[in-house]
């Protein structure tokens, strides 16, 4: 729910700032066809100056900013209630401070007068909160401790989360530059940014593989799911290299799920 709240908040903030203006809507019209091309089914790419296609933004599509902000608030409230339930069950009252930090980080990403997502810090905060804080916090709530495996798992999940953000920012690199939104992708450029995003996925897989190889006798289910994770990350990397960002995003997401499943297998079959 906190993730959903952050997405609504980002849509609201970017919408009222005008950052989402001119961004294309995700559809099958990512190719323009000439009359002669229609008969041969050969697509002609749109000029490079036109914006990359992405999902529709709510505020930019005409939805009332107040409604989007209300949706963010409702999901944040549900997240808070879930967090308070965890606190009540575990007795770890300091989790409230962690929750407050997560709420502030979610809003200040692109909200407020000085959003850190506009000043090259978005990737770092995503690594910390979507990776280490989320994973290690969950582990501590369940087990009362944080192990080396938990830290490594948090780093891996965080790397893939940053890769997802990089794919989004690669798609929007031109419009972000126009509206003064400074991300690592606007600094690196599309070519170097593509290499960086692929490197993030590669490092995540290599860390996971190294951990599994350090096990005395990795179980076959663990190796099998590791292979699936590698395949998904490879497919995502190919999609990123081909600038098919709409395909790369779900592949990165499923790679994160497969990575988590691999760690579960490591624990179950240890």
Give a label for each model feature.
Residues 28, 54-145:
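Intramembrane alpha-helical segments
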Residues 80-96, 134-155, 206-221, 264-270:
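Helix-coil boundary and interhelical linker segments in multi-pass alpha-helical membrane proteins
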Residues 1-27, 48, 162-185:
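Acidic (Asp/Glu-rich) catalytic motifs at the cytosolic membrane interface
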Residues 1-9, 96-107, 147-167:
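Membrane-embedded alpha-helical segments that form the functional core of polytopic membrane enzymes
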Residues 6-11, 57, 104-117, 165, ...:
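C-terminal ends of transmembrane helices
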Residues 213-270:
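Extended hydrophobic alpha-helices typical of membrane-associated regions
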Residues 124-139, 157, 186-190, 250-266:
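Small-residue-rich segments of transmembrane alpha-helices in multi-pass membrane proteins
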Residues 22-89, 181-216, 253-254:
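Multi-pass membrane catalytic core of lipid/isoprenoid biosynthesis enzymes
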């Amino acid at each position: 729910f906190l993730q959903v709240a952050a997405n609504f908040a980002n849509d609201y903030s970017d919408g009222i700032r005008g950052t989402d203006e001119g961004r294309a809507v995700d559809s099958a019209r990512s190719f323009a066809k000439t009359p002669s091309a229609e008969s041969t089914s050969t697509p002609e790419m749109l000029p490079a100056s036109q914006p990359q296609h992405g999902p529709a933004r709510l505020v930019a599509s005409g939805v009332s900013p107040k409604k989007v902000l209300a949706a963010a608030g409702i999901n944040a409230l549900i997240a808070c209630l879930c967090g308070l339930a965890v606190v009540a069950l575990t007795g770890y009252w300091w989790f409230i401070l962690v929750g407050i930090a997560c709420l502030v980080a979610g809003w200040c990403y692109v909200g407020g007068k000085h959003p850190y997502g506009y000043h090259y810090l978005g990737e770092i905060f995503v690594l910390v909160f979507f990776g280490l804080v989320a994973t290690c916090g969950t582990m501590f709530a369940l087990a009362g401790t944080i192990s080396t495996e938990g830290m490594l798992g948090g780093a891996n999940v965080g790397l893939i989360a940053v890769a997802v953000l990089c794919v989004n920012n690669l798609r929007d690199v031109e419009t972000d530059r126009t509206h003064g939104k400074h991300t690592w992708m606007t600094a690196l450029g599309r070519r170097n940014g593509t290499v960086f995003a692929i490197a993030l996925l590669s490092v995540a897989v290599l860390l996971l593989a190294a951990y599994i190889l350090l096990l005395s006798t990795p179980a076959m289910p663990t190796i099998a799911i590791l292979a699936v994770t590698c395949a998904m990350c490879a497919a995502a990397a190919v999609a990123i290299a081909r600038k098919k960002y709409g395909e790369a995003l779900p592949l990165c997401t499923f790679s994160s799920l497969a990575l988590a499943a691999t760690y579960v297998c490591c624990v179950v079959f240890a």
